[in-house]
C-alpha cells in the first residue's frame, strides 16, 4: 500500500525549529513533497533570499521525511496541486490571515475536488524567519551594533 502524498511549500531561506516541527508533522501524514519557492516568487512578497534556489534545495532534500523537492514558481499552489494531486497540504496556521490567506483558501478549494485536505499546524510562537532576518541584517549593517559587539569582545578578552 502506498503512503499518502503530502505537499508542503516554503522558501527555506532561514530554517528554524518551527519549520522542523512542520516537516515532522507532515511526515506523520505521508510522503512529503516540498514545493520550494523560487527566488523570484520569494521576492514577490519578501526580500531576495540569502541563499539561491539550488542551495536551499540541497538543504531541504536532506531533511528527514522529504521524498522530493520541486519548484514552486508562484505563491499560488494551483499548478503543483493539479500536477501532484496530494492528499494533504500542510502549513503553519499563520496563513489563515494576512497576505497568505488567499493562497490557503485557493488550496483548500482545489484539494476539495479530490477529497484532499489542508492541515494547519499551530504556529511556533517564539520564532519566525522575519525576525531572524532582521537580526541578521542588524548584525551585519548597523555600525552601532557592531561597535557594541566589538566593545563586548574587547572587554571579554581583556578580562581573560
Regions found by a protein language model. Name each.
Residues 29, 57-75:
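Short acidic amphipathic segments
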Residues 2-36:
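N-terminal catalytic cores of NTP/NDP-binding nucleotidyl/phosphoryl-transfer enzymes
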Residues 156-160:
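Conserved small/polar residues in nucleotide/adenosyl-binding loops
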Residues 2, 73-155:
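Classical nucleotidyltransferase
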Residues 16, 32, 60, 90, ...:
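Divalent metal-coordination and catalytic microenvironments
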Residues 11-13, 39, 94-96:
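Short glycine-rich anion-binding loops that position phosphate/pyrophosphate groups of nucleotides
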Residues 30-31, 64, 85, 115:
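Residue-level detector of structured alpha->beta connecting loops
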Residues 40-45:
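A short acidic, helix-capping loop that chelates divalent metal ions and anchors anionic groups
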Amino acid at each position: 500500500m502506498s503512503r499518502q502524498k503530502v505537499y508542503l511549500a516554503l522558501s527555506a531561506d532561514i530554517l528554524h525549529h518551527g519549520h522542523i516541527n512542520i516537516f515532522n508533522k507532515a511526515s506523520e501524514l505521508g510522503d512529503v513533497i516540498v514545493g520550494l519557492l523560487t527566488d523570484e516568487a520569494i521576492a514577490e512578497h519578501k526580500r531576495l533570499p540569502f541563499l539561491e534556489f539550488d542551495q536551499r534545495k540541497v538543504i531541504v532534500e536532506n531533511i528527514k521525511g522529504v521524498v522530493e523537492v520541486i519548484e514552486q514558481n508562484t505563491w499560488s499552489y494551483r499548478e503543483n496541486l493539479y500536477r501532484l494531486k496530494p492528499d494533504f497540504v500542510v502549513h503553519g496556521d499563520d496563513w489563515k490571515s494576512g497576505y497568505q490567506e488567499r493562497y490557503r483558501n485557493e488550496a483548500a478549494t482545489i484539494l476539495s475536488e479530490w477529497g484532499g485536505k489542508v492541515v494547519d499546524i499551530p504556529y511556533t510562537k517564539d520564532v519566525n524567519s522575519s525576525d531572524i532576518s532582521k537580526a541578521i541584517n542588524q548584525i551585519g549593517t548597523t555600525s552601532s551594533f557592531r561597535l557594541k559587539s566589538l566593545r563586548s569582545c574587547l572587554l571579554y578578552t581583556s578580562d581573560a
